[in-house]
Amino acid sequence: MGRWALDVAFLWKAVLTLGLVLLYYCFSIGITFYNKWLTKSFHFPLFMTMLHLAVIFLFSALSRALVQCSSHRARVVLSWADYLRRVAPTALATALDVGLSNWSFLYVTVSLYTMTKSSAVLFILIFSLIFKLEELRAALVLVVLLIAGGLFMFTYKSTQFNVEGFALVLGASFIGGIRWTLTQMLLQKAELGLQNPIDTMFHLQPLMFLGLFPLFAVFEGLHLSTSEKIFRFQDTGLLLRVLGSLFLGGILAFGLGFSEFLLVSRTSSLTLSIAGIFKEVCTLLLAAHLLGDQISLLNWLGFALCLSGISLHVALKALHSRGDGGPKALKGLGSSPDLELLLRSSQREEGDNEEEEYFVAQGQQ
């Protein structure tokens, strides 16, 4: 009887993990193709991103309210001094990362976007070394060389290569390295109380919106104000369809973050990292099949080389965590509370610093 119960529990956990991974795939791959599809007819990616931020803030606030009502515990609200001094740098880097990524969809294919964004792990490692979150090891140098070499091979003599778009997405990957490093440092400040990702999202979105607004005003403000799709609309039906499409993108963006957090809280950040590797493969295969992206043998070899570097990085993180009994923490880091999300019963399985390791792993997403 005990063995049967154990088998059932194992099977249930496997089915649950598979379901959460598939949910994450639906949102992650879905928003990539959705944004690419939307920017073909709506050429205002920065405005699109800002609307997504507003939707994410709305749903984050709603999630906090639901958790507060169910737990009868007040959610953390930072003072203005802490908010502007400690959260603002992370919010600005995050806004530029997301904004430039969506902007690049005007010029690059999904396959080139996916491959180049995978290189964010490279920049995360570099900035982690600069901020002394990682120690320089020969294995890390190998990871950097594999990812950089793979990126070079994927873009070398690519028939659908666009310099402007590649510069945008590579810039986003570079800023993404700063973003996730700052996010890790932000979460390690236990006194701020932002270990719960829903609270982090709630506090980041307003500053992200404000940080992206000047870029929007310079590059899209005038054109959008004269566009018949938004402000000078003549067809109410067209306006509602455009706003509905943008709002749906915001729901997908929040769903992506929520599914990531749910997967981590029910399994581990290692599961998310491994799932992210296979997600990149699925994205490229779908891009070649559905959108007709042209990927040569050399490009595939470069992609495989890059994925091997990412896989090595994930394996090193897993071994390092097991060897030290958990991810490396900065001095003064206290125990992190459980991820509550909307499911208060969700318990962590990877130790008190799971959110910290999770955000570092997100560079490949």
UniProtKB/Swiss-Prot annotation:
The chain crosses the membrane at residues 14-34, 42-62, 104-124, 136-156, 158-178, 202-222, 242-262, 294-316. Pfam families: TPT. The modification Phosphoserine is found at S335, S336. The gene is SLC35C2. Glycans are attached at N102. Ubiquitously expressed although the level of expression is tissue dependent. Overexpressed in ovarian cancer. This is Solute carrier family 35 member C2. Its main location: Golgi. Residues 344-365 are annotated as: Disordered. It is found in: Golgi apparatus, cis-Golgi network membrane; Endoplasmic reticulum-Golgi intermediate compartment membrane. It comes from Homo sapiens. It comes from the Eukaryota. May play an important role in the cellular response to tissue hypoxia. May be either a GDP-fucose transporter that competes with SLC35C1 for GDP-fucose, or a factor that otherwise enhances the fucosylation of Notch and is required for optimal Notch signaling in mammalian cells. Induction: In hypoxic trophoblast cells. GO terms for biological process: negative regulation of gene expression; positive regulation of Notch signaling pathway; protein O-linked fucosylation; UDP-glucose transmembrane transport. InterPro entries: Sugar_P_trans_dom, TPT_transporter. GO terms for molecular function: antiporter activity. GO terms for cellular component: cis-Golgi network; endoplasmic reticulum-Golgi intermediate compartment; endoplasmic reticulum-Golgi intermediate compartment membrane; Golgi apparatus; nucleoplasm. Keywords: Glycoprotein, Golgi apparatus, Membrane, Phosphoprotein, Transmembrane, Transmembrane helix, Transport. Belongs to the TPT transporter family. SLC35C subfamily. It is a multi-pass membrane protein.
